[in-house]
């Protein structure tokens, strides 16, 4: 640094006068005037210059030179090919016994020069050249000073260039060593297994050890900084896993006692300080280092290739002497130049090594990154919403986390969040709401490509039943049922897969043929006859075709993937703080549904009333007497199988006509129905209607007006349904189109009617008005809730919808015997209708008597009034409808649902096999409309039902194909299986069923996810983070021969001056017969990304076919993008993405979501795993390993996959994240590398090649025969091991934040779980040290 003279303020002008040209100062003397303009001249004076001084870095004084044999080779630029020959003698062991005697074996290895160069440049301006040459000197002091300054600047430039070559030598040598240094986690397992890779078993064991070492060795200093022995173990592994050099260098490094240094550890300044302070002890603080380079001179015209055995030789005589006689070259008495410098010498194990950090000494302020500071990409995987099996839902001490007094423990509920820590130790969480950008995107419904791919392979219809819908013929329902039962066994040559109660292990077992069609959480894929539905009554014998149907509701997910325990737990959660049926209500209703002696006459009365409010009011006295008698006899509630009856009873008989405790049952029952109805609103956000339907109808199936109740008594639901023209509703009535009939009296009744007319029932008032509904639309919604949620909760599948023979019912009513009487008499009076003398065989009186129902004459006489409003028949209805606005896309618009319903049918509870009234279908016959109402026992009411049909009905619901099919129904077999298999009480089950009827569509998810309703499937959260690493490199002494040629200067003249380009050729050759260097990621420098919870938003990263309804598409975009933190991808040329308003923790890492069965094995996520659910990174694996599920998962041989919605080809997640379909890319998707076959196969082959190359301890390079360099792909072990192994690591996370606060405690607490950190960062963060 040059300092200017310190000038007193009063002498500034005098000094300028002395040091400047006199003419510059004369201006102040020459002009003396009053004109101020004469004093306007100005000039600048350079009073001082401050500059930084570069200190010359001598490479040979650095610890890095320990690993080098540095030789000056002026003729290097003329060498066409330099070769070094190694002679390696294989050691022998003399042994006794019959072994053949070993003979000496000599191996010869040739290595060629690896050519490199160093470049630097500087320029001299024209003005500086003129000053230096003297041409621009004018004899003044200023020009002399400027000339001196130009010379000084040139000297500084030359010094800077020389310094740059010294620094470049260090940088180049460090990079050379890095190129040939494999990671410790790669070399250590090979040392352990001694290169024995003869078969796949040994190779697999090696890969397993590789994974363990990557996890344990990465950041060992950060993890074990307080554990000195653990760090020393890793350092010992590092310095002992390399092979020694074959060179015996003349110039070497030693400590002050003369002990040679065995190698060098090069690392960062931070790691060096931590090692010296906590781990290593200084063996010496100074070292003797060489300060001169060896010389290699090729004299005369000898162009032979020099063979240098790692020695720094003076001339060719040394070479010849060594080759001919093998004698060491004499020193000729000339001392080798050395100097004692400041150094850190430490002992690691039994080796003395030079500890060096070049970060500040060489690289500071050079704008060149330090090679030992790298980046590590780690992909994390976290399970969200997984529900554990019952055996794992326990707590070691139930009082560890006490719930609010008086409330259920929320930790028994299915988890809806996953909690973890970000890089600053701040607790974060991801909930289902974060997944809106994925699940609420139209790509959720895009299955066209999947269908097209599945249809490429021939499909055979194994079982048409459940996959085919027929159009009913114009015939009586009883006749249609008889014909169906005759043909039913032929429709099922094999048991349909949808009816097989497969457990999760069975479904996911290797080789399961049914697994290939389980591709999407929201779609059923099945093989059906290639005909349009509804089709002919007889199933056509045509080719099969793979079809898809939306599952509509989450309850239709197979039980193997969404088990009963989970559904019940979700139902219990919803029941908390909501209405629950009183125990007396539950007992009374349950008793009625299970009563095998339920009075058959009650069904007759239901049929006579057939939902008519007018008729009910007329028969109110009779109904009240029936209820009272049944209540006194059994303490059960009558008519609870009929929603209309329950509503009318509560309205007209609940104010004193019934016993108080009996009336309370019906009131409580309806309060529960209304509570279930309110549940829909509680999980629906306010919003404008879409497609002429309110948001509640788009969110919940039972609120959807297009779904008819299973039993209807009037045309109200049909009228409300027909108002939704956007859904293209169709209604087939006995194979004909719907027509309404206001009401039918005795004179117009036609019991043989097979047309499309339906009786609407006579209204209570306003009889002369045209057709209008009897009740509002809410009545139909409550009716569906009652039949689809309340009834199954009590019946558990032990009920059946029945057709009614109204001709026989009305005949039976006319057979009643009612004696004339003017007063009420007892049953012992002959004037009472139930007196024995009035019990005429086959009369209605007998039915009342047998049921012990006490009714009087006045009540029975009113039955005669029913002829003014009669029912003709039970009519089958087949209602089909297109998807709603929240589910309609180009792919789904033709996927119409077909649901069956009965008009003027009834629901029969427990079957009474010994009641002759039911035999041979005298009054009632089975007509199941849904699997929920298809009890096999009720087939006994149909004549001529064979044993084969009865046996089949025990396993497959006997729903006729003209009333729908499983795959086309809104409510399917899994819901019925849930109701039948559930062990929950009726309150919980009713809420559980209601939760199962929430729809699965992008629009529906906007409500459910925002309201924190578990959607019925779990999610796998995938996030990739980047971490800055501090590496440590170990190199053996004299392990690299480094040649430096003659400096070459290229001169280029230009108008601005002279440009000088300096180039020095360099070359290097490895001096080992193995890997002589190794490195490891010793410490975590800093997280680069925030390790946060920024969710992926597919609206910003990819396109998809939009929703057909423009308003729905706009609603999704507005709802999902509200508060979005992810900027869109710049795909519009120069248009830049929106920049977030602010960032708190730097670069944000993106979380992506993979739909996962809620029953997935939680243990799968406790270790490193593939987010797809199936391993794909095995050494011998190809693309077939990823998708061929006929073979077991290599990592989990007992199953083919943990997630069929992600691991199979063309599955939902595969179509979403597989880059093969050009819909995803590596820049914006952490899942890309796991789902793209090209990436997975490349990494698999790279891993195989890495193992082979490392095992052979040789890897070919581009310009030499054999160099022991780092094998291709080895760098990924410390840069992106997740991509190489095709596995992601679980971080410390928990479904309950309380478990994070006690990470050393139990991992299980009822339904909540804790996942311990199994990533390479385990132990690096204090807040995540579990």
Curated annotation (Swiss-Prot):
Gene Ontology MF term list: structural molecule activity
Cellular localization per UniProt: Virion; Host nucleus
Pfam families in UniProt: Herpes_MCP (PF03122)
A GO cellular-component term linked to this record: T=16 icosahedral viral capsid
Xref: InterPro entries: Herpes_MCP (IPR000912), Herpes_MCP_upper_sf (IPR023233)
Keyword field: Capsid protein, Host nucleus, T=16 icosahedral capsid protein, Virion
Purpose: Self-assembles to form an icosahedral capsid with a T=16 symmetry, about 200 nm in diameter, and consisting of 150 hexons and 12 pentons (total of 162 capsomers). Hexons form the edges and faces of the capsid and are each composed of six MCP molecules. In contrast, one penton is found at each of the 12 vertices. Eleven of the pentons are MCP pentamers, while the last vertex is occupied by the portal complex.
Annotated family: Belongs to the herpesviridae major capsid protein family.
Subunit and partners: Homomultimer. Makes the hexons and eleven out of twelve pentons. Interacts with triplex proteins 1/TRX1 and 2/TRX2; adjacent capsomers are linked together in groups of three by triplexes, heterotrimeric complexes composed of one molecule of TRX1 and two molecules of TRX2. Interacts with scaffold protein; this interaction allows efficient MCP transport to the host nucleus. Interacts with capsid vertex component 2/CVC2. Interacts with the small capsomere-interacting protein/SCP.
Protein name, per record: Major capsid protein
